[in-house]
């Protein structure tokens, strides 16, 4: 199965559509079955490059009113023409498609439950794998076109076995400033910063100062809610503590945002409530849980959270372009632009929704080169003992999360952590089976999710590939 989160950037019309009258090779202009008709209708909609036409097809034939992945593939590929049919019956077909703008092929599988049905039970489109240089070339082409349209400013690095396969950056720190974003430009990390919190806690575990299965009340002795104080460090690290969100990141949470400067301020806003569910009973992603972990770091170490991370992670890993600047000191950080995840058409700066500074839940800054240094240092034992690094990056009670790291097992085994907020997007993952790290830092909505998919889908074969 594909594991990175599907990109969710809402697209406008394609910049390079194939004309709707272009017919697929080896296919009749007069469909003879309902499946033929569905295929012709799909190809016409995709090749139109028109968002409304594509949505109408998916709504009618697949009960999917907002097929974001298909919209992105239509735009990234500039449309399709048939290369050849691999298989075709009255109820199913598999066809390989050429792409106008990108190297390689895409595979489309269509199926209906019964001959004559118009509703599809299977509609699966995905790029076919390419050699390293092909996957990287495709990713760069997608990034180039996004940047040309003002939809991507940021940096990408791909490394294998410690050697750099690709590195590039796009855009300016401020539009029109002439200050180009580079691989050393610090960029907002959003929730990717949770990895720093996890490593910090595990360092304190290694030092014998924190126990994973101890309740947070052992360290935060004056915590205001007795039930929340019983939640363990481990449950917060793997999002099974029921701690909930922090109430400062939404567009409508500006009043809370204005009040918050420190972790203690966040606890003042959120500390009175109990867990949202019995701790350990289920998994629910929680920003507030990592705020509590940050408070434990401060209490046990005697250092402010940002100072601890600087001394114990950034400095040892050689991360000279990383930190936790406040909102008044972001001149060197690229300005993010957002459409509030499709809530509006116009892009606006994300400054109104930025918290005062990054925290233990995320939001610090690092350059692409620094993130590469962090990923390169983690497995060496310099930041964590090997056994704790292994524990952090393997699935536990939560199949997709370790201790502060998003993980996956199987042939696409990986560890890392993405981050998404208004006007910022991060995708940073290490794929263990091919010893490859993909790093994308962006200053736009959901753009790095889209770019890691462009690379990932062309790097790993489909799980059901038979040749």
Task: Place the predicted regions along the sequence by residue.
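Short, low-complexity N-terminal intrinsically disordered segments enriched in polar/charged residues
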Residues: 21-51, 127-137, 281
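Short solvent-exposed beta->alpha transition segments
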Residues: 37, 44, 48-94
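Exposed beta-sheet edge and beta->alpha loop/turn motif
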Residues: 89-136
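Structured C-terminal helix/loop/strand segments within mature extracytoplasmic catalytic/sensor domains
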Residues: 133, 421-467
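Short, conserved catalytic-motif segment at the N-terminal edge
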Residues: 133-189, 209-211
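Active-site SXXK
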Residues: 143, 156, 162, 185-213, ...
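Short, surface-exposed loop or secondary-structure junction motifs
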Residues: 174, 226-422, 426
């Amino acid at each position: 199965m594909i594991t990175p989160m599907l990109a969710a950037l809402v697209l406008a019309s394609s910049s390079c559509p194939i004309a709707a009258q272009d017919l697929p090779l080896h296919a009749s202009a007069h469909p003879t079955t309902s499946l033929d008709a569905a295929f012709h209708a799909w190809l016409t909609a995709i090749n139109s490059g028109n968002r409304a036409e594509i949505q109408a097809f998916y709504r009618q034939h697949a009960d999917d009113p907002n097929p974001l992945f298909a919209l992105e593939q239509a735009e990234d590929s500039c449309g399709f023409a048939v290369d050849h049919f691999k298989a075709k019956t009255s109820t199913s077909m598999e066809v390989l498609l050429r792409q106008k703008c990108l190297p390689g092929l895409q595979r489309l599988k269509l199926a209906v439950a019964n001959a004559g049905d118009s509703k599809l039970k299977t509609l699966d489109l995905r790029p076919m794998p390419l050699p390293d240089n092909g996957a990287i070339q495709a990713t760069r082409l997608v990034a180039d076109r996004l940047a040309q349209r003002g939809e991507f400013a940021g940096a990408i690095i791909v490394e294998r076995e410690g050697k750099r396969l690709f590195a590039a950056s796009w855009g300016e720190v401020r539009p029109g400033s002439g200050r180009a974003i580079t691989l050393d430009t610090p960029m907002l990390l959003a929730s990717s910063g949770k990895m720093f919190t996890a490593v910090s806690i595990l360092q304190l575990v290694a030092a014998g100062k924190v126990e994973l299965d101890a309740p947070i009340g052992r360290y935060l002795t004056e915590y205001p809610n007795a039930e929340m104080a019983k939640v363990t460090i481990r449950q917060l690290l793997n999002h099974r503590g029921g701690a909930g969100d922090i109430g400062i990141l939404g567009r409508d949470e500006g009043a809370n945002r204005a009040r918050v400067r420190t972790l203690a301020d966040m606890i003042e806003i959120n500390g009175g409530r109990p867990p949202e569910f019995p701790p350990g009973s289920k998994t629910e992603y929680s920003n507030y849980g990592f705020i509590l972990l940050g408070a434990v770091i401060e209490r046990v170490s005697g250092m402010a959270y940002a100072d601890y991370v600087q001394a114990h992670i950034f400095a040892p890993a050689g991360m000279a372009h990383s930190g936790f600047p406040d909102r008044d000191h972001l001149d060197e950080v690229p300005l993010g632009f957002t459409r509030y995840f499709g809530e509006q058409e116009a892009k606006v700066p994300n400054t109104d929704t930025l918290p005062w500074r990054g925290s233990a839940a995320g939001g610090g800054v690092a350059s692409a080169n620094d993130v590469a240094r962090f990923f390169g240092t983690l497995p060496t034992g310099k930041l964590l003992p090997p056994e704790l690094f292994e524990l952090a990056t393997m699935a536990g009670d939560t199949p997709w999360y370790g201790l502060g790291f998003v993980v996956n097992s199987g042939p696409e085994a990986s560890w890392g952590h993405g981050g998404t907020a208004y006007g910022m997007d991060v995708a940073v993952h290490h794929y263990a089976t091919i010893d490859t790290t993909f790093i994308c830092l962006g200053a736009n909505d959901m753009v790095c999710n889209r770019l890691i998919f462009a690379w990932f889908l062309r790097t790993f074969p489909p799980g059901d590939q038979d040749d």
